[in-house]
Amino acid sequence: MKKTLALLLAAVMLLSVLAACSSKAETPAEPEQTTEEPAQTPDAPAEETTEETTAAEEPSQEELDQAAADEVAAMIDAIYVQTRTNETDAQCEAAKAAWDALTDAQKALVEGDEASPDYFGLDTGDASKDDPRNQDDIGENELLVVSFGTSFNDSRVADIKGIEDALQEANPDWSVRRAFTAQIIINHIQARDGEKIDNMTQALDRAVANGVKNLVVQPTHLMHGAEYDEMCEALEQYKDKFESVAIAEPMLGEVGSDATVINADKEAVAKAITAAAVADSGFESVDAAKEAGTAFVFMGHGTAHVAKVTYSQMQAQMQQLGYENVFIGTVEGEPEETSAEAVIEAVKAAGYTNVILRPLMVVAGDHANNDMAGSEDDSWKTMFEAAGFT
């Protein structure tokens, strides 16, 4: 009986303890709710945090400037192409409008795969002095002058337009028209200056639409290179649309099988460019320049095309004419003996101390202004000066 009573008392005590513990554990729950409510009451700190976050998310002026410049760079890259599309006109116009809307600071930030501030910002002369020669009313006889092209306005007016004007004067019964083979140049001129120049397809379509019967194509290309080949391929598609088609030779004539095969065209050009270089530099003759330790270096473009032997032929022609202080080089270094490094070594080995650089190109455009006479470390002028020449 006593044991039973003891067990009952123990059970009652255990239940009391458990109830007390349960009561103590639940009691703080109310204060927890009470303490949380005051923490939510003040609204001011939360608003300040939101304002600070919004301010931090707003782009800086520098970021806005870069974004505007990047947009224009993308538009330039889009028109910096070799093919023309139905969108080209609109793209050129939109890119120029976007450029004009930039501040000077934003224009300086324009950089893309091909884009730079110079695309629109470089002053190359007055484009209004040029004549794109893309007019209709051609007549039955057309003389189509085909050039690679240049975006340098002054050079285009002096060189390409100069050739076209001379041909028109010499052939008054023929209508002289123009075509460029470099769509990249055509797009650049159109976007920057609003001047539209025909590519080969446009020029030939124009001739057909105007009822041209006799077509003579005169390239201003230096030699039978890739551009000349592409021109001939384009003409092949239109031969049956005219009564007669004639294609003239490039300036240096036939390529020849090797460096020893030199034609009359190369001889005439070699004499003409050397005489002009001698006269412009103030010497009485090429021999007088030689006596003064002066060498003339003519820089061509260069090519991986089989026609690259033309440059070797021109060097051989200079030697045959007795022009020992005249050297032929190329921007591309093709063929290898025409690279800047190779020519510098050749001039140095011959003992000359003064060098006069001249372009071996129909147009003194980007290559002549930058690759030859520019101030960059890889320009020929800089490289010759670094080698100790004056």
Give the ranges of each region predicted by the language model:
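Short extracytoplasmic/periplasmic juxtamembrane "stem" segments immediately C-terminal to an N-terminal membrane anchor
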Residues: 32-39
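N-terminal low-complexity, Pro/Thr/Ser-rich intrinsically disordered segments
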Residues: 39-75, 116-142
